[in-house]
Structure formats: C-alpha cells, structure tokens
C-alpha cells in the first residue's frame, strides 16, 4: 500500500484537469511514480489506442520508466485479474524502447508507450500524450549551451510531435534557474 502525500494529490489533480502541466519537486518525492507510471497505466487502461511518449534526460532513464509501466501489465496480479491480459500478441512490439498492448483496435505506427532520451530522434512520430519526466539533470543544465540545446530539442523536435488536442505533462527537479523549467 502506498502513502499518498499532498504533493501526489496535487500532481494527480493537475494532470487530470489540464492538458499542459509542470510539476516540480525535489528528488525522492515520488513524482515519477504518480505522474508517470500510474498515469500511463491509467490512460492505457482507459484507451488502448493511445500513443504515449515518456521522455527523460537519457534513453536509459526513459526506458527504466517504460519498464516499470510494462512490468505492471506483465506481472501485476491485481491488474491482470481485474483488467485481463494486456501483454503482447505475436504482431505487437514489446521491448525496452516501446510496447503495444494487445487490446488496440486501431492500427497505428506508434506504439502504445515509447521511451525517448533527451535529444533522441522523434521524426515522423505523433503522440496523444507526452510525459517529460526528469528531462533536466545536472548533465544538461550546467552551461548555457547545454540548456540551450535541451530547449531547442524540446521545442523544435519533441513538442511538434504532440497531436493538436494532446496532453503534455512535465515532471522534474530544478537544477538551474534558467533551465527548461523556467
């Protein structure tokens, strides 16, 4: 059983009631669990045709978030008992970078959930929901050039992949007053 803090309630309220959110808090406060993992699972269960992208400061970190979501669909006995089997069929992709649930009724080139590290290529992709979780880290916030590169990637590569009626939710920790979260 999880202890839900006021911060978690605030994040849940924000992402449930707005198409564009920014939630910042120190490391270790559970932002990712509530605003990333739990939210992705909820959205996928509600709409198996959804296309969600989880972005993080590195590909490895983005894949770790995706793996946590995917593992719930593979091993969470309560989720499987209540909602059934959502794992892959022989035609669906199911790996560390992306997965597609077997309940989809519309053919789409994008997976149900895709993991992408900051500065990764997103050409020809379109997403209904983008979750930027810890896009900013010490490694890309120290210098003006690093901050500028991240902002350029975010606004000219990532943001245009969001569908016109899509949602974008950013979760993170501030590392510099002039970082992406300014």
Give the role of each language-model region.
Residues 1-182:
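Short, flexible loop motifs at catalytic/binding sites
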């Amino acid at each position: 059983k999880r202890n839900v803090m006021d911060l978690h309630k605030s994040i849940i309220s924000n992402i449930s009631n707005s198409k564009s959110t920014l939630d910042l808090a120190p490391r270790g406060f559970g932002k990712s669990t509530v605003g990333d993992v739990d939210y992705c699972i909820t959205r996928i269960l509600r709409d198996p045709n959804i296309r969600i992208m989880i972005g993080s400061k590195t590909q490895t970190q983005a894949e770790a978030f995706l793996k946590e979501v995917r593992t719930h669909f593979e091993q969470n006995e309560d989720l499987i008992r209540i909602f059934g089997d959502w794992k892959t069929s022989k035609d669906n992709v199911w790996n560390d970078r992306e997965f597609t649930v077997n309940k989809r009724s519309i053919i789409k080139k994008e997976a149900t959930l895709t993991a992408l590290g900051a500065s990764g290529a997103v050409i020809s992709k379109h997403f209904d929901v983008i979750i930027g979780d810890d896009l900013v880290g010490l490694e890309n916030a120290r210098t003006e050039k690093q901050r500028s590169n991240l902002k350029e990637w975010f606004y000219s590569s990532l943001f245009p992949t969001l569908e016109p009626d899509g949602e974008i939710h950013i979760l993170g920790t501030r590392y510099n007053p002039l970082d992406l979260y300014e």
